[in-house]
Every structure is written in structure tokens, then in C-alpha cells.
A protein has these predicted regions:
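Signature of extracytoplasmic/envelope-associated structural regions
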Residues: 1-258
Length: 258
């Protein structure tokens, strides 16, 4: 019998979407990973002088999905962003800067992963895993709290696998006390006006949709394409202390004019 506390979660970067690869990194902050195999069946109802609902059933297609909850770390958050947004080229050194932006004129190049979870002989991988929804959340408290990340992923399918022998990595959790929040006028310079002694917490929700491409001759999808982002699907919620700074922000919102 598997013991979930002995599970580990590993990832490997795929070259071809849906083609399994060996895992190359153990994710260090995972709290839970819930697999969801998607297998569709079709019942065929015919007039046969019977009240039975159907006489034949066939597999009609499949895919895979997963829900992932993790503690945000400076090292592993890159897996999440590149799976959701695109693979970024870092610049600088100590710290590195990685620019992430919503797609505009071209389809993004997102990170496809073989996402593996299990222990002993009970090991399964989501092939072609990408993140479609991600929520980052942190809240100041009496004890400094960590940032949490929740993700919804889709992939080609779940398949049996084996875990590779990978070592733990040293990671650094992202804490609420590490954050700074800036709010600037539209058209101004981002990152200029700091909201000091004001922000108590935040929740940032990002959705980067993906659509399966399906072809004759295969139960499972053969690729992905990425439609435009929905305006209402990407949100930032702030918990703010009502002080003079916030008062002016509220006044500008309720006093808006065409």
C-alpha cells in the first residue's frame, strides 16, 4: 500500500509535447498533487424494442489534468511561470531578471513537462503537463507567512512511470515580509510609488488558456494551441489598511468620470 507522505513529485522538460522524458528535478515545496485522468465514453442508443439505455459503449477520447498546491520558493516558482506563461531568457546575475508577459502577436513557447508523482510501484506521470491557472497568495500575520501557489494543469494523458533517483535541492521559501507593493498611475512608470505600511495581503490569479488539438486516429490530443486571454480571468486582490494613501485611491475610483 502506498503512503502518501512518502510520495515525491518530479519533473522533466519535454521536447515534444506528450512524449515522456526522464525527470531531472524534484519539486521541493509540493503540499499536494491531485491527478485527474479524463477518459470519455460514448453510449450508443438504438431502437431495438428494449428500454435498456444502450447496447454498445466505446471509448470516445481522453486527456489528463491535475491540481497542485505548493509553498512558493524562489527556485521552483520558475517552473510555474514557464509552464503558465513562456520560457524566459534570464538577464543579469545575482539577482537574475526574467521578463514574463502575456502573449501578443505570436503563440507563446511554454514549458511542457512530464510531471511524475508516486512511491514504490504506484507511480504515474502527466505527460505534456502545462499550467492553465495559477494563484499566488500571501498574507501578513503575527507569524511571518509564506506565499502559497495553487495551479491547475492539463496534459495529454496520465501514464504509468517510474521515479528517477534525484536528490533534494536547497530552496528558499518566499515570505510575506519579502514583498513590496507599488501602485502607479496608468501611463506612468511602473514600480515608482511604493505602498508602504499599507498592504496586508494579496491574491494574484492568472489564467492562460489552452485548447487541445485532436486528430483522426488517436484517442488522445495531438497538441495544444493558445487562445487570447480573458480580461476577467486575470485578477489582483489587495487587502489594504485604510490610510491617507488608500483614501486618495478610493476617491479616484468612486469619482471616476468619462
Amino acid at each position: 500500500m502506498s503512503v502518501t507522505s512518502l510520495f515525491n513529485v518530479q519533473v522533466g522538460k519535454e521536447t515534444t509535447w506528450g512524449t515522456a522524458v526522464a525527470q531531472t528535478a524534484k519539486l521541493m515545496g509540493v503540499k499536494s498533487l491531485t491527478p485527474t485522468p479524463l477518459v470519455n465514453t460514448k453510449l450508443f442508443k438504438h431502437l431495438r424494442g428494449s428500454l435498456q439505455p444502450a447496447f454498445e459503449a466505446m471509448l470516445a477520447g481522453g486527456a489528463g489534468a491535475a491540481s497542485l498546491e505548493e509553498t512558493g520558493t524562489y527556485e521552483d516558482i520558475l517552473f510555474a511561470f514557464e509552464s503558465l506563461m513562456h520560457i524566459a531568457t534570464p538577464t543579469g546575475a545575482g539577482p537574475y531578471t526574467r521578463p514574463y508577459a502575456a502573449p501578443h502577436a505570436t503563440q507563446p513557447t511554454r514549458r511542457f513537462e512530464t510531471l511524475c508523482q508516486g512511491q514504490g510501484s504506484d507511480i504515474y506521470s502527466l505527460l505534456g503537463a502545462i499550467t492553465t491557472t495559477m494563484t499566488l497568495k500571501a498574507m501578513a500575520g503575527e507569524n511571518d507567512t509564506e506565499m502559497t501557489i495553487t495551479r491547475e494543469l492539463i496534459g495529454q494523458k496520465w501514464a504509468e512511470d517510474t521515479v528517477d533517483s534525484l536528490s533534494d535541492r536547497t530552496v528558499n521559501p518566499i515570505m510575506a515580509s519579502h514583498f513590496a507593493c507599488y501602485m502607479d498611475a496608468w501611463g506612468g512608470t511602473m514600480g515608482t510609488t511604493a505602498l508602504t505600511a499599507t498592504v496586508k495581503g494579496f491574491e494574484l490569479s492568472l489564467m492562460a488558456p489552452a485548447i487541445y488539438k485532436r486528430y483522426l486516429g488517436n484517442l488522445f490530443p495531438g497538441g495544444l494551441e493558445y487562445p487570447e486571454w480573458g480580461f476577467s480571468d486575470n485578477k489582483l486582490k489587495l487587502s489594504l489598511e485604510f490610510n491617507s494613501t488608500v483614501n486618495s485611491i478610493v476617491d479616484s475610483i468612486i469619482g471616476a468620470a468619462a
